[in-house]
């Protein structure tokens, strides 16, 4: 016990020295999280041995120490990969690398230069919410673990960033309006200035034209979007603290797509369930090729979609859309495979919907990753 107490004291002394040093070097932040990990590992072991106190330190429950140790391991590994990137020489403080910053939206990304974004739902001060937009967002590529620095952006649809030409929303004002608003309208303010104000419903929102003074705290994001996106949509402002170029009003309405931004379809064009356009090998199959709107004999059947594709890709996609649960779908399954048959290792994730209308809305709004197929169908309802 004395050996454990002395090691714990040494670990805590190292942590105090790091706090007093208040370094802005990334290697010191990695060392800090390594010590946090070691501290919780020792407390976990002490609790396993039946100890409730080690010196002056109260030993927490096993689950508490285990959870904190796992969090420390996750952050430490993320910082170690960041150390191998081109951004390791930037200033990284304890505040920049804390757990709260790691888990703040967008989750599992590093963020800098936060700025408050005020959104008034229904135009009422009683229904306003404050969100944090980030000037710089450090995103890790899921394929090769490399880090990329992208600017945080804001428009009338929400807070987002663009990575590899794909728009990733981490705050969707339309979905937030379902929670905090009634009429489906809202107003976005950055730095005390109104940059967008909606006067119609969520589905027909148009950005208000802003002058140079209104957009003065923001900067054009033309360098952050692809040539295709800039050719069809307005360039949203970023949240970086630098000079900006005025943006032009969007020529057409826009709609938020999970993981990407698509142009709103023409109002004269009807999209029927099971007939959503697919691009880049993303296809949607009909459960019944003769009539996609067929009835179902089982009164307890509920509409579902089986997403088919590579297991890791499906897991990442499910993680991205789970924040929109109850709005775009009811629940999602874990990744599953067929146990026997033709030996195909294709994975599936099943999404459950409360109605055919909700499923149709999902197919219309959600952008599927490349290689993922959506297979609509029905399942018997069960708890």
Swiss-Prot record:
One of its GO terms (biological process) is regulation of DNA replication. Pfam families: PPV_E2_C, PPV_E2_N. It is found in: Host nucleus. Residues 303-383 are annotated as: DNA-binding domain. InterPro entries: E2/EBNA1_C_sf, Nucleotide-bd_a/b_plait_sf, Papillomavirus_E2_C, PPV_E2_N, Reg_prot_E2, Regulatory_protein_E2_N, Regulatory_protein_E2_N_1, Regulatory_protein_E2_N_2. Residues 233-297 are annotated as: Disordered. Phosphorylated. Residues 1-202 are annotated as: Transactivation domain. Coiled coil: none annotated. Its main location: host cell. One of its GO terms (molecular function) is DNA-binding transcription factor activity. SUPFAM superfamilies: E2 regulatory, transactivation domain, Viral DNA-binding domain. Gene3D superfamilies: 3.30.70.330, E2 (early) protein, N terminal domain, subdomain 1, Papillomavirus E2 early protein domain. GO terms for cellular component: host cell nucleus. Residues 267-297 have a biased composition (Basic and acidic residues). Keywords: Activator, DNA replication, DNA-binding, Early protein, Host nucleus, Phosphoprotein, Repressor, Transcription, Transcription regulation. The keyword Repressor applies. HAMAP family: PPV_E2. Belongs to the papillomaviridae E2 protein family. Plays a role in the initiation of viral DNA replication. A dimer of E2 interacts with a dimer of E1 in order to improve specificity of E1 DNA binding activity. Once the complex recognizes and binds DNA at specific sites, the E2 dimer is removed from DNA. E2 also regulates viral transcription through binding to the E2RE response element (5'-ACCNNNNNNGGT-3') present in multiple copies in the regulatory regions of the viral genome. Activates or represses transcription depending on E2RE's position with regards to proximal promoter elements including the TATA-box. Binds DNA as homodimer. Interacts with protein E1; this interaction greatly increases E1 DNA-binding activity. Interacts with protein L1; this interaction enhances E2-dependent replication and transcription activation. Interacts with protein L2; this interaction inhibits E2 transcriptional activity but not DNA replication function E2. Interacts with protein E7; this interaction inhibits E7 oncogenic activity. Interacts with host TAF1; this interaction modulates E2-dependent transcriptional regulation. Interacts with host BRD4; this interaction mediates E2 transcriptional activation function. This is Regulatory protein E2. It comes from Human papillomavirus 57.
């Amino acid at each position: 016990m004395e050996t454990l107490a002395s090691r714990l004291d040494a670990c805590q002394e190292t942590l105090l020295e790091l706090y007093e040093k208040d370094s802005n070097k990334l290697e010191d932040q990695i060392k800090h999280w390594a010590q946090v990990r070691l501290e919780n590992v020792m407390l976990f072991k002490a609790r396993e041995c039946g100890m409730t106190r080690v010196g002056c330190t109260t030993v927490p429950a096993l689950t508490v120490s285990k959870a904190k140790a796992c969090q420390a391991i996750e952050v430490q590994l993320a910082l170690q990969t960041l150390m191998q990137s081109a951004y390791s020489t930037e200033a990284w403080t304890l505040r920049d690398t804390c757990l709260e910053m790691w888990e703040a939206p967008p989750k599992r990304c590093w963020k800098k230069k936060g700025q408050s974004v005020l959104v008034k739902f229904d135009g009422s001060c009683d229904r306003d919410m404050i969100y944090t937009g980030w000037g710089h967002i450090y995103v890790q590529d899921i394929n090769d673990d490399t880090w990329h620095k992208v600017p945080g952006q804001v428009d009338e649809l929400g807070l987002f960033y663009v990575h590899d030409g794909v728009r990733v929303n981490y705050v969707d004002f339309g979905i937030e309006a379902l929670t905090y608003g009634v009429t489906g309208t809202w107003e976005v303010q950055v730095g005390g200035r109104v940059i967008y104000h909606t006067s119609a419903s969520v589905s027909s929102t148009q950005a208000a034209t802003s002058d140079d003074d209104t957009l003065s705290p923001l900067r054009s994001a033309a360098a952050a979007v692809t040539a295709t996106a800039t050719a069809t949509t307005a360039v949203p402002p970023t949240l970086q603290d630098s000079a900006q170029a005025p943006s032009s009003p969007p020529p057409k309405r826009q709609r938020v797509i999970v993981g990407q931004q698509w142009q709103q379809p023409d109002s004269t064009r009807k999209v029927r369930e099971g007939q959503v356009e697919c691009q880049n090998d993303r296809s949607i199959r009909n459960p019944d090729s003769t009539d996609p709107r067929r009835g179902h004999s089982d009164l307890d059947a509920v509409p579902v979609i089986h997403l088919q594709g590579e297991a890791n890709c499906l897991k990442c996609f499910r993680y991205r859309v789970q924040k929109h649960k109850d709005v775009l779908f009811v629940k999602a399954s874990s990744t599953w495979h067929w146990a026997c048959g033709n030996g195909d290792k294709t994975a599936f994730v099943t999404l459950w919907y409360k109605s055919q209308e909700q499923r149709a809305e999902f197919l219309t709004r959600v952008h599927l990753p490349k290689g993922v197929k959506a297979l609509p169908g029905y399942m018997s309802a069960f708890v």
